[in-house]
Design a protein with these regions (language model features):
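Surface-exposed binding/hinge segments that line
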Residues: 19, 88, 107, 125-172
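Ligand-site clamp/hinge motif
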Residues: 182, 208-253, 384
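Extracytoplasmic/peripheral linker and loop segments enriched in polar/acidic and small residues
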Residues: 17, 380-397, 424-494, 517
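Gly/Pro-rich hinge or "lid" segments in bacterial periplasmic/extracellular proteins
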Residues: 62-63, 154-215, 219, 229, ...
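N-terminal lobe/hinge region of extracytoplasmic solute-binding protein
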Residues: 30-80, 111, 118, 184-188
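Long beta-strand-rich cores associated with HINT superfamily self-processing modules
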Residues: 491-517
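Aromatic- and charge-enriched surface segment that lines or borders ligand/interaction sites
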Residues: 74-120, 147, 234, 281-283
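Structural transition elements
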Residues: 311-345, 361-369
Length: 517
């Protein structure tokens, strides 16, 4: 075990006097203050971890998988042409404010999200429209049956319903609070909203009127603790019961420390470098491949990330086992081959690059440490990258506007709910920043576009899988990204906390959590 992180923690702890939470309360150290508790507004995993304890959707992910399973809908049928989905709703369900959950409430939610003329529309940004843009109509058949009519077959529809964007809010509460609803949420989940003290906490309480198995603990408190070392100190001092997204060094140290438990699980996450395919050295695919061969992925995963991530290849995370190509492997570390390709492309050993990297951010692992290691690997073959780092929101503004005229490569991470999401948003020719997409490197291969569209519309999973594997092989051959790995999400808790589980969705369900007295 390395001592340095613990020395820092002990120095911090010398000034800590946090009172331990009571036995009926679970305190979670989050990475940031939530933006909103309205599922039609927020897009951050940090906020999702709170939302999934307050709300439910028609569909949820089956525990331990990314497979759609019944939620507030007990069953559903799909028309033969894939254009109509009819859901049977669970009877007797009420929102936390006492209003009934029924088909009219479902229609209100989706019309609020999709229709610009809805009186409570305009609550949030992309990706809300993307997830459900194929909905042409929402029809109430009776109080417990609702039908969605789509404009075209859309295979990810059920998976998107299970995502937090599909969580259902109380129409009564929305009408009462209007644009302020995000700070006064009301769902149907096992916990109800109690209060939100800015920069201090969000508090939830067990909902005694819950329609399912009641939560096993009385209260949840989510505290924003932005500094990871402070999260460690709070955990050590007993001020919090569990902490999320600790540094690789601290996770490694906690694995062997008595009195604590470490939960880790790989999910649908990718960390990669976006390459500027429009201009500069990386417009040549040989240079892109050379850069990939220059990077020592094993050293990044084991030495820098301390095994908090696993190797990945291609644009489809391996968490989607049915869609990912098991034969696709990362490039080996081969500096000699990299130098040969660079010479073939006429690239000298004094080539300068601009590498953009955030100082932090959801799913970004250890971006500065990774960038420094990558910088050294690239320099070993004559590619000299100048690192420029930014605060997360400033970084997104830079990268999402496109790399042309700004940089040669940039670090990025995505967590997705379906194999469709990342290719559609970030690899299509029509997904350039100028067109509202996230293809910041301007990669374009019409054959990939065709496969993305065919996969979206194929309702037969085996056919979808064939399309995803074909497009993954094309993308890997073109090398518009250098894919490094998939994050093993981590949670460190005190040993007295039981009933915790990590899901491949990265969501944190706490209704089964308990604390030993």
């Amino acid at each position: 075990m390395r001592g340095r992180p613990w020395l820092l923690c002990l120095l911090i702890l010398a000034g800590c006097g946090q009172q331990s939470p009571p036995p009926d309360t679970l305190v979670v150290a989050q990475v940031a203050e939530p933006r909103s508790l309205d599922p039609q507004v927020t897009t951050a995993l940090n906020d999702f971890r709170i939302l999934v304890n307050v709300y439910e959707g028609l569909v949820r992910y089956r525990p331990g998988t990314l497979e759609p399973a019944p939620g507030l809908a007990t069953s559903w049928t799909v028309s033969e042409d894939g254009l109509s989905y009819t859901f049977q709703l669970k009877p007797g369900v009420r929102f936390h404010d006492g209003s009934p959950f029924d088909a009219e409430a479902v229609r209100f939610n989706f019309e609020r999200m999709l229709y610009p003329d809805h009186p409570y529309h305009g609550t949030g940004p992309f990706p809300l429209a993307f997830f459900f843009e194929q909905i042409a109509a929402v029809e109430v058949l009776d109080p417990l049956r609702i039908r969605f009519v789509l404009s075209e077959p859309f295979a990810p529809f059920l998976s998107n319903l299970a995502y937090p964007t599909g969580l259902l809010v109380s129409p009564t509460a929305v009408r009462r609070w209007g644009q302020g609803y995000g700070r006064h949420p009301s769902g149907t989940g096992p916990f109800r909203f109690v209060d939100w003290r800015a920069d201090e906490r969000v508090q939830l309480g067990r909902f005694d009127g819950y329609h399912g198995e009641p939560a096993r603990i009385d209260r949840l408190i989510f505290r924003p603790v932005t500094d990871p070392m402070t999260r460690v100190a709070e955990l050590m001092a007993g001020g919090v019961d569990l902490a999320l997204e600790l540094s690789p060094d601290n996770v490694a140290a906690f694995r062997d420390r008595d009195g604590f438990q470490v939960l880790e699980r790989t999910g649908p996450h990718l960390w990669f470098l976006i390459l500027n395919c429009r201009e500069g050295p990386f417009a040549d695919p040989r240079v892109r491949r050379a850069a990939s061969l220059a990077i020592d992925r094993d050293a990044l995963l084991h030495s820098v990330l301390r095994d908090t991530a696993v190797a990945a290849a291609g644009p489809i995370p391996r968490a989607f086992a049915w869609a990912a190509d098991p034969g696709l492997a990362p490039d080996p570390h081969d500096p000699e081959r990299a130098r040969s390709l660079l010479a073939e492309a006429g690239i000298g050993d004094d080539t300068e690059l601009r590498l953009l990297v955030p100082r932090g951010g959801s799913g970004m692992l250890a971006p500065l440490a990774m960038a420094t290691a990558i910088q050294a690997d690239l320099a070993s073959v004559g590619l000299h990258a100048r690192i420029e780092s930014f605060e997360w929101n400033s970084y997104l503004a830079q990268v999402n506007d496109g790399l042309a005229g700004r940089a040669d490569l940039a670090a990025m991470a995505w967590m997705t709910n379906d194999p469709d999401t990342l290719p559609y948003l970030a690899l299509r020719c029509a997904a350039s920043p100028e067109q509202g997409g996230f293809n910041s490197g301007y990669y374009c291969n019409p054959a990939v576009d065709t496969l993305i569209e065919e996969a979206r519309q194929a309702t037969d999973r085996a056919i979808r899988a064939q399309h995803y594997r074909s497009l993954a092989r094309l993308v890997e051959a073109d090398a518009p990204w250098i894919v490094i790995g998939s994050w093993r999400q981590n949670l460190v808790a005190r040993a007295r906390v039981a009933g915790l589980r990590l899901e491949p969705s990265f969501f944190l369900y706490l209704d089964g959590a308990t604390k030993q007295r």
